[in-house]
Curated annotation (Swiss-Prot):
Lineage: Eukaryota, Fungi, Dikarya, Ascomycota, Saccharomycotina
Cellular-component GO terms for this entry: endoplasmic reticulum membrane
Highest taxon of the lineage: Eukaryota
Lumenal side: 19-269
Family of the protein in this entry: Belongs to the BIG1 family.
Membrane protein topology class: Single-pass type I membrane protein
TM annotation in the entry: 270-290
KW Transmembrane (keyword) present: yes
Glycosylation site list: N173
Protein name: Protein BIG1
One GO BP: fungal-type cell wall biogenesis
Phosphoprotein in keyword set: no
Gene coding for it: BIG1
């Protein structure tokens, strides 16, 4: 009996501790230029509007990353982001919507749990997973004050990119809110638009949840996500990389093997069949050589004549 009471007390303590660490929920968007199969399956696993635990969210992210089909894995933290922002002010996310709409794989989650531990570690475990799984050795960190002046790298090495955007202030003034969203949307476009490769995977969320309330049935960027069929995964950008980066033709020797070159035999039949052509080639060659010889002889005579004239003139001047 005492043992059972101890177990119950332990469970209640863990629940209370978890609740004390929970600081809210944030929406999340995941998308990839190239097809990342398996993402759509999670739509059936998560109830619409339900809070998705951080562990489950990380599992979805790892599924997206594990295909290693991107030249840049981008993690975006947008402090102060609310579900209402992505629903009520969807038009202000002009460039984010465009990136989602033109992706091959995309998913959104309305509510992902955020704890104090998550705020401290943020994308740390996912960054480590991406670098280990996809053999990525370089990481670029872009702080809020660098978002406006970011200059892209020019090398072609795969990278993990961490973007920390300026915070959305918890203002309910519609005009101010729209201006903040539009400004950060432009900042994100400035960064993503300068990446040397169009093949990217992006995870966009917030580790500093907003306290602004959202409608219970709010949808994330509905116009952007409506283009996707949740029952069919389709590669929509199969030609994008080839069109953006024209490749070089592989070297191929004219003859693969000298031993395979068939020798031309000047037999009687060959000579009879090609007598006219061979005669024309021979005559043309002789005439060409004769013409070259005459030209050379003529130039030689002109040089000798000019030399003699110059000598005569010098002699006359001397007298």
């Amino acid at each position: 009996m005492c043992g059972l009471i101890g177990i119950i007390i332990g469970l209640l303590t863990r629940v209370a501790l978890a609740s004390s660490l929970d600081v809210g929920t944030s929406p999340a968007i995941l998308f990839s230029t190239r097809l990342s199969e398996g993402i759509l399956e999670y739509y059936d696993m998560f109830d619409s509007g339900a809070v998705v635990p951080r562990e489950d969210f990380n599992t979805v992210c790892k599924t997206l990353i594990s295909h290693c089909n991107s030249d840049a894995v981008v993690f975006v933290n947008q402090p102060g982001l609310s579900l209402g922002d992505l629903s009520e002010y969807a038009d202000q996310f002009q460039y984010l919507s465009s990136y989602v709409r033109h992706s091959s794989s995309a998913m959104n989650i309305e509510r992902v749990s955020v704890s104090q531990d998550d705020q401290e570690s943020q994308f740390e475990s996912l960054v480590r997973y991406a670098m280990d799984t996809c053999n990525i050795y370089e990481k670029v960190v872009i702080e809020p004050y660098e978002a406006d002046t970011y200059k892209a790298y020019i090398d072609a090495e795969k990278k993990v990119i961490l973007i920390e955007l300026p915070e959305f202030l918890n203002t309910q003034n519609e005009t101010d809110r729209m201006a903040l969203i539009s400004s950060n949307d432009n900042r994100l476009r400035n960064i993503l638009g300068q990446l040397p490769s169009p093949d990217i995977s992006v995870i966009y969320t917030s580790f500093q949840p907003s306290n602004l309330a959202a409608d219970e049935f709010a949808e994330i960027l509905p116009a952007a996500f409506d283009v996707f069929d949740k029952n069919a995964a389709v590669e929509r950008n199969i030609r994008l990389k080839d069109a953006t980066r024209p490749g070089f033709i592989n070297y191929r020797p004219k003859f693969g093997d000298f031993n395979s070159i068939s020798q031309i035999k000047l037999d009687k039949q060959f000579l009879e069949e090609n007598l006219g052509l061979l005669s024309a080639i021979l005559v043309s060659t002789i005439l060409y050589l004769f013409g070259q010889r005459l030209s050379s002889h003529s130039k030689s005579q002109n040089t000798t004549s000019n030399s003699a004239k110059n000598t005569t003139k010098k002699a006359e001047r001397g007298n």
